[in-house]
Amino acid sequence: MGYPQDLLSSRSIIKHGKYALIAPEGLVKNVVPGFEESDVSILSSPKLGASFVDYIITMHKGGKNTGFAGQADVQSFLYVIDGKLKATADNEEYELEQGGYIYCPAGTKLAFENLVDGDSKVFLYKQKYTPLEGVAKPKIVTGNTNDIPEEDYDGMTNMRLQDLLPTDDLAFDMNFHILTFDPAGSHPFIETHVQEHGAYLLSGEGLYNLDNEWIPVKKDDYIFMGPYVQQACYAVGREKLSYIYSKDCNRDPEL
């Protein structure tokens, strides 16, 4: 990167346990065992206050991971932002192109490798699984967001939702969704809830309310939202704003 061309500054904001905005220009590369020919940045972890770990990964030619997660109590999720991957789980192979994803339940190791001569860009997640008495753990789920219809959000046609995992299966203690806003679209109200989110902006620009602070956000930004932090979004500019995010669900909080 070389010598700076101006005063050092950053758009990133870190409020441990509450929220964080992490801009891409401040990311550093982390050495994570298991990754080859890949640039890995850890976006969130319990050190930030999250109950999960999110990564953004650029996989170069020959890039791969031969065994991500897979511990008895750790589930994982992978989403292809750009490029093409081969993913392997439980001895089954899956080709994932842009918009492709795979969920692996606790105890299932995930292997993946870049299939293109250039770079593939991947959003990766892991979290401990909370079992539910009398309910079997989830199965592997794979799909592509390009095949999932967008549903109007709360009756509004300028805000739409895609569910990447089943919403009617109590085996899942988390889900992934994509929200898309037309320019000038917004949430219907400022939300306050127990769930936490890790969100990666796929396109567009907006203003995000985090703990009652309106913060500019744009494509390739990452947002962590902790429990009970006020949150809502306005889309601005001429392009649709879209982001993928995780959400815990289907469990009663423990005392």
Question: What are the roles of these predicted feature ranges?
Answer:
Residues E92-E93, A106-L132, P227-P253:
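Ligand-binding loop in jelly-roll beta-barrel domains
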